[in-house]
A protein has these predicted regions:
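Conserved core of the sugar-phosphate nucleotidyltransferase
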Residues: 110-189
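A structural signal for short hydrophobic beta-strand segments in well-ordered beta-sheet cores
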Residues: 25, 144-146, 211
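Left-handed beta-helix
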Residues: 177, 184-354
């Protein structure tokens, strides 16, 4: 079995962060989202992975390399334009050959990984196995319709009137039968080759398509709110570790201070992770905050936020529920609001009331 990881797309819902960074490389708990998926694939016993890349291919390739750090062998497949999930399968046809494969969306996060899903697929080997979860607003997703016996009878991409609340999670397992389905597709009204149409073709052609409804946590980290929520979830399971320098501080709960970091005269309430080389002085860092490497936080309060590497936050009364990019400077401005809620792209310069 191989894996096909989709790491293209423009990440419009995470702009301005993704103007300068691939969305799959935005970190959660100081580790890129894509890396969690690659680790899950390796844990499922898969060793060969094709990574579909677009305009950010150089950045993705530099981060992942040959895949050996994950126990994988990575091959990069260039998709010139984001023309749908089924189009990614189409351009990967030669790479996939006659192997079964798992298709994994690189900006998705699934608690517990995919090992159990892969084991079930290997044992039963349906033509397709789709991962489903119940959502409050299925209109934003591909939606599956099941019959009274729990069999998949229909799929629809982002329907105006959903027939169920079962959304397709960004993990699919296929036999080579999917290639016959993709070959028959025509572009949808969105101008894309839809994987839901390909799976529907399998259903209509009498192939076995099995659902797997997950009860665990899944998020598409394509927007800031979901990114912050996944960051919260990962930090909740972190183990406390103090490898850096801590002086005259109050440290409470699950706090990670990486080697080379310095925290002085501050209060840190976990779960929190503080990256290598970061200096925090006279500040409060509250729960569910990730601060990347080589940052400066001085005389400020921050909580429930993600701060990327080399950012500087100085003299700011309070920041919460924010995603702050690389090399950002946040400093006081004359007036003082109660709190600041920010999404700042790399190299931004922002003045904020203190």
């Amino acid at each position: 079995m191989k894996a096909l990881v989709l790491a293209g797309g423009s990440g419009t819902r995470l702009r301005p962060i993704t103007h300068t960074q691939a969305k799959q490389l935005v970190p959660v708990a100081n580790k890129p989202v894509l890396f969690y998926g690659l680790e899950s694939i390796a844990e499922a016993g898969i060793r060969e992975v094709g990574i579909v890349v677009g305009d950010t291919h150089a950045e993705i390739e530099a981060a992942v390399g040959d895949g050996s750090r994950f126990g994988l062998q990575a091959t990069y497949l260039r998709q010139e334009a984001p023309l749908g999930l089924a189009h990614a399968v189409l351009i990967a046809r030669d790479y996939l050959g006659d192997d079964d494969f798992v298709m994994y969306l690189g900006d998705n996060f699934i608690v517990g990984g995919i090992e159990g899903l892969a084991e079930r697929f290997r044992a039963r080997r349906p033509s397709a196995q789709i991962m489903l979860t119940r959502v409050s607003d299925p209109r934003q997703f591909g939606v599956a319709e099941l019959d009274a016996n729990g069999r998949v009878v229909g799929l629809e991409e982002k329907p105006r009137e959903p027939k169920s609340d079962l959304a397709l999670v960004g993990v699919y397992l296929f036999t080579p039968a999917i290639h016959d389905a993709v070959a028959e597709l025509k572009p949808s009204w969105r101008g894309e080759l839809e994987i839901t149409d390909a799976i529907q073709w399998l259903i209509d052609s009498g192939h076995d398509v099995e659902p797997s409804v997950i009860s665990g946590y899944w998020k598409d980290t394509g927007n800031v709110a979901d990114m912050l929520e996944v960051n919260r979830l990962v930090l909740e399971s972190s183990e406390p570790r103090i490898d850096g320098d801590v002086e005259d501080c109050e440290i409470i709960g699950r706090v990670v201070v990486e080697a080379g970091a310095s925290v002085r005269r501050s209060r840190v309430v976990g779960p929190v992770v503080i990256g290598a080389g970061t200096v925090i002085t006279g500040s409060y860092v509250g729960p569910f905050t990730s601060i990347g490497a080589d940052c400066v936080v001085s005389g400020s309060e921050i909580e429930y936020s993600i701060v990327l590497s080399r950012a500087s936050i100085q003299g700011v009364r309070r920041i919460e529920a924010s995603l702050i990019g690389h090399d950002v400077e946040v400093t006081p401005a004359p007036e003082t609001p109660r709190a600041h809620r920010l999404v700042l792209g790399d190299h931004s310069r922002v003045q904020i009331s203190s």
